[in-house]
Each structure stands twice: as C-alpha cells, then as structure tokens.
C-alpha cells in the first residue's frame, strides 16, 4: 500500500488506539500533527513539555490507556527528561516520540541538536531510531508493543528528514504476548508457606493495580484472614473500607499497618519491587519482620530480592499468582488463630483511627522547637493535619486524587482511602516536584466524568504553575487543585531544623505571591481558605463547579509546622573541621 511516512506513522497509532498526545507544537513533527484532527487524535498543547509528560503519566495511570508525548527536537525533547524518568519508576507505558535533527546535518552542532538516544537510554525500556523511511510503521509498532509489555516508556527517535517520503509497505500485524504466568512449583511452595502461617500479611504494590488484580487479592486475604498493607504511594491497591485493609506502609503511613506487619511470620508481597520507602521505619517502629518468610512477586525478575532478602521469588503477573495460591491453599489455611487475628486487626485499626483523628499538630525532636514556634507565630491557623481532615470530609469516594511530593502532601499519606484502583496518583520513587497539577489534568482528560482533585505544596506547585495558562481553554476539562500555602520548602526546611541549627538556605518563598490571584488572572476560579470549615466548604463547591465545567484553585493557608523528614536514614549532623571563612572568597579573573 502506497502512503507517506507520516500517514504510516498515524495509521499505526490508530491501530493501537493511541488517540491522545501531549506536548508543545514544533516544526520537526508538523507533518504528523497535521494529520491528528483527521485521525481522531487529540493534541493537548501544554505550557511546558515536562508538565506534558506528567499529564501523560496521569492519563495512563487513571485509565490504563497509553498516551503519546511529542515535542520539538533539542530543547523541547530535553524538557521531557524528568517526566519520562518519573513514568519509568511509576511503571507507566508511554510512547515517547522524539523528532531529531535531520540526518544531513546531524553531528555538525547545529540548531536544536542533542544526542536524544543517549539522553533517554536509562529512562526507557526500549528505544529505536528510524534509519529507513520504509521501516517507520514496523519500528513504531515494535516500540509501542515494548512499552505495553514492559509497562514503561519506550522511545522512537525520528530524524526530521524522514517525513514526507512516499513508501510502499504493508502495515505490521504484530504479536501481543500474554503476561508471564507463574511457575507451578513456586505456587505450591508459596501456598504451603501461607497455609502454615500463624500471622500472614499481604503487601500490595502497583503491580496489583496494573494487573487489575485487586479482587483476587481480596479473595486471598479473606481466605487467610490476613491484613493487607499497601506500598508507599500505592494506597489504592486495596479497598479502603475492607475490614482487612490496614493502610499504607512507609513515610507518614498507617501506624496500624506497621504494627501488624511487624507481627508477620509470612509476608506475601504482590506486585511490588519493595521500594525502600515501603520498608523504612516510621513513627519510631522498625516494622519490617526480619525473621518472617517473605514471598516477593514482581513481573520483572530483576527487581526480586533487590532491596530486601526474600525466601521465595515469583516473576509473574500478580493476579495470576494470587489466584494460583488461592487454588492451592490447604484446607485449614488461615484457620490457625483466625478469630484472635481478626480481633487483633480490628483493635489495631480502631486504635490508629482514633489516634489519627486526634492528631492536630507535629512534634518536635528533643532539643528542637520549630513546630512549637510555628504554632505560636500563627495562632488559630490550620495545621497541615487539620487541613487534611477538612479535605477528606469533602472528598467523594469515587474521586481520583493526585499528590505532589513534599512535606505537606506526605503528611496526607495516612488520610484518604480508595474503593478501587487507578484512583491515587503520586509522583513515585523518582520524586519530582511539580507532579500534582499536571497529573490530575491528565487524569481528568482520561476520565472526564470522574471528579478529580490535585494536591501540592506551594514550593512544588511553583514548578508547574504555568499550566494554569493552558488549562482554561475550551477543549481542556475542568479540574480542582488544592495548594497548601505555608510559604516554604517544607521538606528541606525540616532538614534544616533537625540537622543544620535552623540555618535556612533557600527555603523561604515570596509572601507577595497569591496563587489564587494567578488562577484568577488565567481566567480560572481562585479562592483562599483559612479555616477547616472554609476549606471543606470550598472543596465541596469546587467539585460542584468542576461538574459544571469550571476549574478552581484553592489556596489553603496553613501554619508552618513541619512533619517527619523524608530521610532520617540519609541525614547526619555536619561537623566542622577546617572551617569556612567569608574572607577566603576571591574575585573571579576577568
């Protein structure tokens, strides 16, 4: 069949159902974008390519459908770097299209030229550069299938002089492979370990959500009467209202989950690479059960046993493993101490729920007083925990939430729960600031009938604030965004209070800036909430307005209390050896 290279490219996109693209328009790919309207492909032109990549991440994580990111070669493509690495650690399949400088000029250090294959080599599961125009459909088809198979970004690099060529090809048929099935002997061994367990605990990770295996883990947990914890930032991997749900592990997570995990004699880790933040101590509890038998299930064999010793590893689909274990459990599996275990789970959860409901303020470490001073400086102001309680009072159960990284968002780890998967979008282990706003925009584009709420601290929000200039247009859906406003980079300031004697370098934000005012200047609704009552009411109204097509940014004014530091394990108090003298500073030579 005769066609142009750009027609072949778009036809492959259509065959794979990729109908949504994010980026900023550029001359290097206009032959492709010219065909988007006729092909039924929506192009969302963001304010910054990095945010566009995070929109694509949010789009796919909320819906399970792959999106494409595309930008001008050189500086447009380099702006994708943070977003692509974020998607890689979020296990998000993503088509990364990188137009390249023309073959006839590349290597001359020309306009908008950079080594784009080298740039993404450690950030994608697969990458190919098109060498022959006649192979464009074959290469694109393979890149898309690789992204889906590995659940990760994959890159196609397109020299711009490959377009507007007439080729005669057959479109590739391709082959879809099933997800890896578990080894029968490994399932037998896992079932035997769990059948004899006195206190089994299940830890669900992102792989459970990606495999749509939550119902399978519910059935397995109920058979074993096993409490279920979720990994850090994967709070939607088990129904929040289920009696066996213990909550999230990790930083500012559920104390109940940590206490129950510490008692386990067998731990089944489903769909998780056991990222370090899911096993670090919290609330003073070193909860990972070092004497327990640990069964780790991950679709990627390279991640099994990578961060923690395991007794048994199974490289397979989490749902297939859960179903296989359930079918092989012994007749008395879960019966040992079942009633006592159920009572202990309920009591532990109840005790933590009461404690969490009464936690208004953050504690100071011995010898420090920042939080005490922060409360005294702004009496009557909401604390971060008060703000989170006010927020959860207004959240509908079906809402999709996004969270940025930072101290105030992390404090919220213990608060919202979810009835289904693909409802909680956090920045993941790459940890980029500026994720909350673009991710929730992408989620709303993917799920226009579902209410969405994004969260960010005011430092992180400043990185993506320019997207307010993009989202007010008629073809963009309405969203709701909550910004915690305490005028500081909280995580870094917390480190300064604990290890650097309140020497605040680069932690203070501009008191003159109003994010609500910026939203209004962009034609959106911007409101300020100063109390818990105002915040709950503002969020309820914003969600109603969202349903009516209006975007609202809520600037929630809070005091400057600071929660737990992210990295107690990585920080130490500095020592003075040679000392630093300002008199040693010399002028630079001219």
UniProtKB/Swiss-Prot annotation:
Gene Ontology molecular-function annotations: acetolactate synthase activity; flavin adenine dinucleotide binding; magnesium ion binding; sulfoacetaldehyde acetyltransferase activity; thiamine pyrophosphate binding
Up-regulation conditions: Induced by taurine via TauR.
A Pfam family matched in the record: TPP_enzyme_C
SUPFAM superfamilies found in the cross-reference section: DHS-like NAD/FAD-binding domain, Thiamin diphosphate-binding fold (THDP-binding)
Compartments it resides in: Cytoplasm
InterPro entries: DHS-like_NAD/FAD-binding_dom (IPR029035), Sulphoacetald_Actrfrase (IPR017820), THDP-binding (IPR029061), Thiamin_PyroP_enz_cen_dom (IPR012000), Thiamin_PyroP_enz_TPP-bd_dom (IPR012001), TPP-bd_CS (IPR000399), TPP_enz (IPR045229), TPP_enzyme_TPP-bd (IPR011766)
Keywords, sorted A to Z: Acyltransferase, Cytoplasm, Magnesium, Metal-binding, Thiamine pyrophosphate, Transferase
EC numbers on record: 2.3.3.15
A single GO BP: taurine catabolic process
Lineage: superkingdom: Bacteria
Pathway: Organosulfur degradation; taurine degradation via aerobic pathway; acetyl phosphate and sulfite from taurine: step 2/2
Catalytic activity entry: acetyl phosphate + sulfite + H(+) = sulfoacetaldehyde + phosphate
Gene Ontology cellular-component annotations: acetolactate synthase complex
The protein's required cofactors: Mg(2+); thiamine diphosphate
Similarity comment text for this entry: Belongs to the TPP enzyme family.
Name of protein: Sulfoacetaldehyde acetyltransferase
Species name: Rhodobacter capsulatus (strain ATCC BAA-309 / NBRC 16581 / SB1003)
């Amino acid at each position: 069949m005769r066609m142009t290279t750009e027609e072949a490219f778009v036809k492959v996109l259509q065959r794979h159902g990729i109908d949504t693209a994010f980026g900023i328009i550029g001359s290097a790919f206009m032959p492709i974008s010219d065909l988007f309207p006729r092909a039924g492909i929506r192009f969302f032109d963001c304010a910054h390519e990095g945010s566009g990549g995070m929109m694509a991440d949010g789009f796919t994580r909320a819906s399970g459908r792959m999106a494409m990111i595309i930008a001008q070669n050189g500086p447009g493509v380099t702006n994708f770097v943070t977003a692509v690495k974020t998607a890689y650690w979020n296990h998000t399949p993503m088509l990364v299209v990188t137009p390249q400088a023309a073959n006839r000029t590349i290597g001359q250090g020309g306009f908008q030229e950079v080594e784009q294959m080298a740039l993404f080599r450690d950030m994608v599961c697969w990458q190919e550069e098109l060498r022959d125009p006649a192979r464009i459909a074959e290469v694109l088809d393979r890149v898309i299938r690789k992204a889906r198979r590995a659940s990760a970004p994959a890159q196609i690099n397109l020299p711009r002089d490959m377009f507007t060529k007439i080729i005669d090809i057959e479109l590739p048929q391709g082959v879809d492979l099933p997800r890896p099935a578990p080894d029968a002997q490994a399932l037998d061994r896992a079932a035997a370990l769990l059948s004899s367990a006195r206190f089994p605990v299940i830890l669900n990770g992102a792989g459970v959500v990606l495999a749509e295996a939550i119902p399978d883990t519910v059935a397995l947990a109920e058979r074993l009467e096993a409490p279920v914890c979720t990994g850090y930032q994967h709070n939607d991997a088990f129904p929040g209202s289920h009696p066996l749900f213990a909550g999230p592990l990790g930083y500012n997570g559920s104390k109940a989950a940590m206490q129950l995990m510490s008692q386990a004699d067998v731990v089944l880790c489903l769909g998780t690479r056991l990222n370090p933040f899911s096993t670090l101590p919290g609330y003073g509890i070193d909860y990972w059960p070092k004497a327990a038998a640990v069964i780790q299930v991950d679709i990627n064999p390279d991640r099994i046993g990578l961060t923690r010793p395991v007794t048994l590893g199974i490289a397979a689909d989490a749902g297939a493993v859960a179903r296989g274990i359930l079918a092989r459990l012994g007749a008395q599996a879960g019966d040992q101490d079942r009633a006592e275990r159920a009572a202990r789970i309920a009591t532990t959860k109840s005790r933590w729920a009461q404690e969490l409901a009464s936690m208004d303020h953050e504690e100071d470490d011995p010898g420090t007083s920042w939080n005490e001073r922060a409360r005294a400086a702004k009496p009557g102001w909401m604390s971060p925990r008060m703000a989170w309680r006010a927020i959860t009072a207004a959240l509908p159960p079906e809402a999709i939430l996004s969270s940025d990284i930072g101290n105030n968002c992390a404090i919220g780890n213990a608060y919202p729960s979810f009835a289904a998967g693909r409802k909680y979008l956090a920045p993941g282990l790459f940890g980029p600031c500026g994720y909350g706003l673009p991710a929730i925009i992408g989620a709303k584009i993917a799920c226009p009938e579902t209410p969405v709420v994004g969260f960010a601290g005011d430092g992180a929000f400043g990185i993506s604030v320019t997207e307010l200039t993009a989202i007010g247009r008629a073809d963009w859906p309405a969203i709701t965004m909550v910004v915690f406003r305490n005028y500081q980079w909280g995580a870094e300031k917390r480190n300064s209070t604990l290890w650097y004697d309140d020497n605040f370098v680069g932690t203070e934000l501009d008191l003159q800036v109003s994010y609500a005012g910026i939203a209004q200047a962009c034609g959106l609704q911007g409101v300020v909430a100063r109390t818990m009552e105002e915040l709950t009411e503002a969020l309820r109204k914003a969600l109603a307005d969202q349903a009516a097509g209006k975007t609202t940014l809520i600037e929630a004014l809070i005091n400057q209390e600071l929660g737990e530091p992210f990295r107690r394990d990585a920080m130490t108090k500095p020592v003075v050896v040679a000392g630093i003298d300002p008199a040693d500073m010399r002028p630079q030579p001219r």
